[in-house]
């Protein structure tokens, strides 16, 4: 078989002299490879050398191959499968929203009298729920998270309901005692965690308590401040707007007076509710006897077996957050069809005005809209970013129209994440949103004001920190997942509405346990694969061919591959990525050491034959190496970076080992594919220049100019990957994105950061 050489001469590789006459015939089974010339100025991208101490030695990782470990791994996989099946069952039965019961809303529904004129409540099961759910200290409210506002609101409402029907005096007395002893604590509540409409609803409850002669410290200074705030807010409410168009004010009608119910009834949601609030709807029914309001209340009382939530339904919100949590926890691949069903539902209900928590609510918000935009765009749906203009005013972005408080952390965090998914030609609103949200979050982060008015989650500061420090273009899936496993609170996360509530479908411990087990399986596979990769590396004697820290280069190369391609059935792809990266680094190190391929005198077949490949793909792999090595020679004289060609080599190798590679001449989608290659090469070359510019102390303006160029090309690559040619396999398109994002990650991260991520992702056990 003829041997290819870029200069039509034999080359010495790594100081192993050989001439054409000295060339030995290939042994049976040995595959011939290419000898080419290339030059790379400095390592960049996946070849960046880290300077940390060595990672665990091969003896330490061999324990993962012991029979007992394999048995443990099998048990863990079986347990993981069981949990995954449980999550899948829940997703397939997803409906209008699974949410905890609100004692406050249940009590207001319990006040409704029988429709037939008889004595007693229309919904006696609500009374049963109240009686059965008093807490040991005499209060009602969230049992696991103590917030005084939540406990006072819930307890006072339950006492009012029981006293109104003159039943369960003992429970009323215990509830009153709790209120009497704790009302003063309202003055010390966390301002950022104020319940929705608290200053409107609590005075209304207190007025009802007065009418029932309940012994409550009405002159408590904390209550005087709340009454004053109520008057201030009610005075600001434009009555004509309240009665003429849907607003968030409809969510708190139970706290308002002098309402024109005939006008308000025209503003009901299609399901008969007022802004999906049982308490507000119960008040409306009490005042009007409207049949649609009754049907809404009757339906939720039956669904929740006597108790009612503080808001319902939440069909859009629940689907969006479930998909987001599953994705960030790294287990979304197990629920492909279920996620598709969820997002199809979201897309069907997408509107030019955005999204609300439910499809029938006319009052849209930026939180649901931004999350919906981001997920739909990520999964290939066509959505217009101009929808975010609905939440922009005077250069600022807000969550809800007419909100009285400044924007809060989580809505701006979700909008910031969404704003990074830009395509060429998109309206400038995404750029403006990114700038505003980043500034807002930086300000909150810098002043340590990270409490959110909508959620009390385990580690919101950590989530925001990751998003700020690692933009989407440089965020690798396994890094995000490993960190999110420590940030996700599971069943401990609480949401703030009129009262505290919990979203049990996507905030639960089953998600967390399944994700941790899944990640533990991944870590064990990584350690086994790394052990094998080390042995291959030592057996191949690659260390002698150069490199500042070959062992760390090995670790970094494998880490970048596994941080992107982590599925158990794709081991060949990540190992192919790692081996090709190591070989390319060895060739490049050697050529840099000897002054370029022009000073080489022998062939490269010994080195290239170290890459194992199936005969079916040998031609493709040879061609990939040939083109990369030719690029060395072509770019040697021009001093151009070889990083773009290295990125293409990695893409082609991954596709070859994944069994998806098609020879160039056989591609029906040649133009689209070549565009992906050109963008990938160009971006990675620019990232190399960025690294060099920083190392050489060039101006900040120069680095920013390169960043802008990278961002523009990244937008085009993102569009082509997420919504590009359907003739190109989705996995193939994603391969380009994986490789480019790995180059971005290395370009933007210090070696110390990369080392810490390697340790965290692969070696620190998930607890």
From Swiss-Prot:
Motif (DXDD motif): 365-368
EC number annotated for this UniProt entry: 5.5.1.14
Phenotypic consequence of gene deletion: No visible phenotype under normal growth conditions. Mutant plants exhibit increased susceptibility to the rice blast fungus Magnaporthe grisea, and reduced capacity to inhibit germination and growth of lowland weeds in paddy soil, possibly due to decreased levels of momilactones and oryzalexin S.
Enzymatic reactions: (2E,6E,10E)-geranylgeranyl diphosphate = 9alpha-copalyl diphosphate
GO terms, molecular function: magnesium ion binding; syn-copalyl diphosphate synthase activity; terpene synthase activity
GO cellular component, one term: chloroplast
Principal subcellular localisation of the protein: plastid
Enzyme class: isomerase
Domain notes: The Asp-Xaa-Asp-Asp (DXDD) motif is important for the catalytic activity, presumably through binding to Mg(2+).
Protein task: Catalyzes the conversion of geranylgeranyl diphosphate to the phytoalexin precursor syn-copalyl diphosphate. Required for the biosynthesis of momilactones that exude from roots and act as allelochemicals against lowland weeds in paddy soil.
Miscellaneous notes: Phytoalexins are diterpenoid secondary metabolites involved in the defense mechanism of the plant and produced in response to attack (by a pathogen, elicitor or UV irradiation).
Family statement drawn from the similarity comment of this UniProt entry: Belongs to the terpene synthase family.
Protein name: Syn-copalyl diphosphate synthase, chloroplastic
Organism: Oryza sativa subsp. japonica
Origin organism lineage: Eukaryota, Viridiplantae, Streptophyta, Embryophyta, Tracheophyta
Gene encoding the protein: CPS4
């Amino acid at each position: 078989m003829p041997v290819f050489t870029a200069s039509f001469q034999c080359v010495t590789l790594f100081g192993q002299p050989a001439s054409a006459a000295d060339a030995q015939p290939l042994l049976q089974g040995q595959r011939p490879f290419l000898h080419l010339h290339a030059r790379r100025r400095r390592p960049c991208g996946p070849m960046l050398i880290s300077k940390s101490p060595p990672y665990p030695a091969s003896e330490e990782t061999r324990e993962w191959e012991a029979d007992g470990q394999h048995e443990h791994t099998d048990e863990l996989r079986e347990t993981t499968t069981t949990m995954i099946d449980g999550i899948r069952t829940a997703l397939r039965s997803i409906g209008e929203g699974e949410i905890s019961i609100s004692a406050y809303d249940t009590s207001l529904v319990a006040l409704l009298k029988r429709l037939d004129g008889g004595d007693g409540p229309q919904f006696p099961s609500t009374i049963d729920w109240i009686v059965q759910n008093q807490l040991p200290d005499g209060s009602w409210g969230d049992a696991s998270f103590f917030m005084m506002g939540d406990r006072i609101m819930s307890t006072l409402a339950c006492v009012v309901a029981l006293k109104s029907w003159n039943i369960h005096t003992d429970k009323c007395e215990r509830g009153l005692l709790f209120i009497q002893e704790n009302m003063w604590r309202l003055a010390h509540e966390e301002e950022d965690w104020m319940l929705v409409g608290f200053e409107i609803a609590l005075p209304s409850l207190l007025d009802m308590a007065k009418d029932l002669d309940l012994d409550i410290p009405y002159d408590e200074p904390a209550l005087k401040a709340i009454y004053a705030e109520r008057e201030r807010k009610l005075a600001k409410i434009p009555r004509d707007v309240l009665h003429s168009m849907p607003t968030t004010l409809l969510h708190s009608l139970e706290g308002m007076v002098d309402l024109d119910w005939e006008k308000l009834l025209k503003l009901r949601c299609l399901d008969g509710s007022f802004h999906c609030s049982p308490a507000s709807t119960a008040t409306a029914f009490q005042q009007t006897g409207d049949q649609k309001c009754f049907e809404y209340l009757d339906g939720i009382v039956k669904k929740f077996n006597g108790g009612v939530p503080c808001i319902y339904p939440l069909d859009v919100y629940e689907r969006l957050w479930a998909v987001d949590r599953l994705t960030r926890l790294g287990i979304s691949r197990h629920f492909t069809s279920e996620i598709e069903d969820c997002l199809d539902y979201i897309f069907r209900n997408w509107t030019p005005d955005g999204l609300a928590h439910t499809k029938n609510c006319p009052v849209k918000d930026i939180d649901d809209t931004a999350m919906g935009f981001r997920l739909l765009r990520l999964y290939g749906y066509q959505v217009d970013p101009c929808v975010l203009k609905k939440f922009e005013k005077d250069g600022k972005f807000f969550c809800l129209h007419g909100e009285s408080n400044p924007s809060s952390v989580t809505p701006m965090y979700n909008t910031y994440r969404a704003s990074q998914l830009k395509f060429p030609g998109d309206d400038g609103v995404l750029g403006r949103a990114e700038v505003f949200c980043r500034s807002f979050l930086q300000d909150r982060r810098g002043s340590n004001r990270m409490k959110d008015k909508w959620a009390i989650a385990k580690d919101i500061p950590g989530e925001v920190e990751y998003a700020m420090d690692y933009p989407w273009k440089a965020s690798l899936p396994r890094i995000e997942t490993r960190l999110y496993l420590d940030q996700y609170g599971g069943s401990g996360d609480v949401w703030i509405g009129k009262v505290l509530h919990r979203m049990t479908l996507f905030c639960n411990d089953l998600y967390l346990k399944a994700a941790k087990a899944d990640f533990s399986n991944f870590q064990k596979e990584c350690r086994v694969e790394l052990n094998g990769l080390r042995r291959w590396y030592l057996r191949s004697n690659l260390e002698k061919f150069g490199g500042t820290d070959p062992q760390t280069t090995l670790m970094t190369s494998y880490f970048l591959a596994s941080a992107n391609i982590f599925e158990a059935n794709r081991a060949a792809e990540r190992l192919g990525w790692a081996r090709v990266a190591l070989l390319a680094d060895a060739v490049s190190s050697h050529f840099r050491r000897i002054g370029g391929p022009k000073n080489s005198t022998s062939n490269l077949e010994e080195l290239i034959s170290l890459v194992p490949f199936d005969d079916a793909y040998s031609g493709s792999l040879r061609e990939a190496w040939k083109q990369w090595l030719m690029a060395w020679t072509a770019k040697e004289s021009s001093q151009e970076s070889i990083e773009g060609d290295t990125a293409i080599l990695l893409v082609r190798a991954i596709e070859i080992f994944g069994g998806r590679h098609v020879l160039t001449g056989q591609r029906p989608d040649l133009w689209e594919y070549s565009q992906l290659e050109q963008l990938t090469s160009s971006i990675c070359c620019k990232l190399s220049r960025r690294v060099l510019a920083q190392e050489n102390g060039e101006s900040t303006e120069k680095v920013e100019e390169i960043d802008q160029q990278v961002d523009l090309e990244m937008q085009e690559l993102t569009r082509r990957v997420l919504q590009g040619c359907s003739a190109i396999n989705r996995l193939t398109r994603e391969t380009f994105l994986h490789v480019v994002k790995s180059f971005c990650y290395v370009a933007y991260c210090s070696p110390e950061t990369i080392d810490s991520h390697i340790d965290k992702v692969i070696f620190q056990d998930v607890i």
